[in-house]
From Swiss-Prot:
Subcellular location: Host cell outer membrane
KW Ligase (keyword) present: no
Assembly mode: Interacts (via C-terminus) with the spanin inner membrane subunit (via C-terminus). Part of the spanin complex which spans the entire periplasmic space. The spanin complex is composed of spanin inner membrane subunit and spanin outer membrane subunit.
Cellular component terms (Gene Ontology): host cell plasma membrane; membrane
Signal peptide: 1-24
GO annotation terms (biological process): killing of cells of another organism
Periplasmic membrane side: 25-96
NCBIfam families for this protein: P2_Rz1
Protein function: Component of the spanin complex that disrupts the host outer membrane and participates in cell lysis during virus exit. The spanin complex conducts the final step in host lysis by disrupting the outer membrane after holin and endolysin action have permeabilized the inner membrane and degraded the host peptidoglycans. Host outer membrane disruption is possibly due to local fusion between the inner and outer membrane performed by the spanin complex.
Gene, per the UniProt record: lysC
Record protein name field: Probable spanin, outer lipoprotein subunit
Major subcellular site: host cell
Topology with respect to the bilayer: Lipid-anchor
Length: 96
């Protein structure tokens, strides 16, 4: 006796649907953490064309100030990202 193809397909579909009726623990609710950190912007470095030692000294001070401003921007963004990471990990630790 030969089984028709559509009958086998219908039976397999029913078996697959029955497997989906088993009880399983509910999936944890995903935690959405918005990225509220400021955007990274370029850190402009001042150009220089020193003619005297005094000009060179002034250029060095300008460069040091520009680097300090850039470092403070990077530090602020790093701190913001660390806070976001901590908020993301908190619900996962509380679920245990």
């Amino acid at each position: 006796m030969r089984t028709k193809i559509f009958a086998a397909g219908t039976v397999l579909t029913c078996l697959m649907l029955c497997a989906g009726c088993t009880s399983a623990p509910p999936a944890p609710t995903p935690v959405i953490v918005p990225n509220a950190c400021p955007k990274v912007s370029l850190c402009p470095m001042p150009g220089s064309d020193p003619q005297t030692n005094g000009d060179l000294s002034a250029d060095i001070r300008q460069l040091e100030n520009a680097l300090a401003r850039c470092a403070s921007q990077v530090k602020m963004i790093k701190h913001c990202q660390d806070e976001n990471d901590a908020q993301t990990r908190q619900p996962a630790q509380g679920a245990d």
